[in-house]
Amino acid sequence: MLIACEESQAECAAFRALGHIAYSCDIQPCRPGGNPYWHIQGDVTPLLKGDTAFVTQAGFLRTVPRWDLIICHPPCTYLCKVSSVHMKIGGRIQWPRLRNMILARRFFMQCINAEAKYVAVENPLPMARAHLPQPSCFVQPSWFGVKYTKKTLYWLKNLPPIMPQLEHPNPRCFVTASRGKYRSRTFPELAHAIATQWSQYILDDMK
């Protein structure tokens, strides 16, 4: 199993805890306290094709003939709806930002078309200009006991939607002064639900 664009290793660790062979991959090293033996630091694009060899952050060579499951968290900076306000300044298109959106969309589609039987791609609500495919479903962290709401969309291939487990009675919007990687990290409760539900589904489907 490959978790693309994940330095937090939240989902990777959740799958590992269930006994699955899972790796995270990100251009950044895994966060302090993470497991470098499970992390691949570098461009994930070649790995999306499967039948690959790579060196973990800890320096060990691994080979994978195929991935059973690929979960991708492509960067949303230039794709999400909230960033669309920066696309124009004074009524004029900001061409460098438009170019970055096009490149981000290209990578997003590479994730959707990853060569695995089961694929999931996660992102927030996209801007209309990006022309992304319709998402398959959405989730809220509060559905799994987290006290925050942070609507997240999923594009799925051969996977069912993640089902709610324990609704928090009084959730509030997830707002933080931090940006980037911290804001995009998967809550552990959601990571556990993803690993539990999808791994069981895949095991049943493979019987």
State the predicted function of each range:
Residues 1-207:
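Conserved active-site and SAM-binding loop architecture
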